């Protein structure tokens, strides 16, 4: 299946781009979707798996800890939290983002395996990630692996695994896009359902 799209990178190398600038670029370019790809970490080297987040409030301590780590590089301060609360409360993309996150999480879970077993599915979660605030489109943050887990780190170093991650993300994006009215996914000659 071929999904025709234009990918706009907020960065293509390891240079830092402020979290707020990433969403601002997506808005400026009038992107249809925003995907932030991250590597998780934990104090336990045994932690592993995948999880996908969308922007909203949470009382889940684990989700808050992940958001705190990711938000640590933000230019926002605690005193600006009230504005953050207002932005989230006014967001009309929360439900769309939750559905988008579910499609991404399902695809990652179905397509990524650790050896002979699937990666643990840590689920779809909500958290106040600065990088997702203000997005004018459905937006998610995918934690694709734990960099703090030596086995997962080793897999991430292989081009084959990174390609599988990219393909799983792509499949999740296509699955979500197909649920939207008016979106047609182009098919290649070899894909199922393509005209003869």
Where are these regions (language model features)?
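Active-site-proximal helix/loop segments of hydrolytic enzymes
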Residues: 1-196
């Amino acid at each position: 299946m071929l999904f025709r799209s234009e990918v706009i990178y907020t960065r293509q190398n390891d240079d830092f781009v402020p979290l707020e600038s990433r969403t601002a670029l997506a808005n400026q370019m009038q992107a249809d979707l925003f995907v932030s790809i991250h590597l998780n970490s934990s104090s336990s080297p045994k932690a592993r798996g995948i999880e996908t987040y969308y922007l909203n409030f949470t009382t889940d301590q684990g989700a808050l800890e992940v958001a705190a780590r990711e938000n640590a590089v933000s230019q926002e301060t605690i005193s600006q939290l009230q504005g953050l609360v207002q932005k989230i409360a006014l967001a009309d993309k929360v439900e769309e983002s939750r559905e988008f996150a579910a499609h991404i999480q399902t695809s990652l879970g179905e397509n990524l395996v650790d050896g002979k077993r699937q990666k643990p599915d840590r689920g779809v979660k909500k958290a106040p990630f600065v990088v997702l605030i203000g997005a004018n489109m459905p937006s998610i943050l995918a934690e694709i692996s734990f960099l703090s887990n030596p086995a997962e780190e080793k897999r991430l170093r292989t081009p084959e695994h990174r390609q599988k991650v990219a393909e799983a993300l792509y499949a999740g994006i296509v699955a979500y896009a197909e649920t939207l009215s008016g979106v047609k996914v182009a098919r290649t000659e070899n894909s199922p359902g393509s005209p003869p």
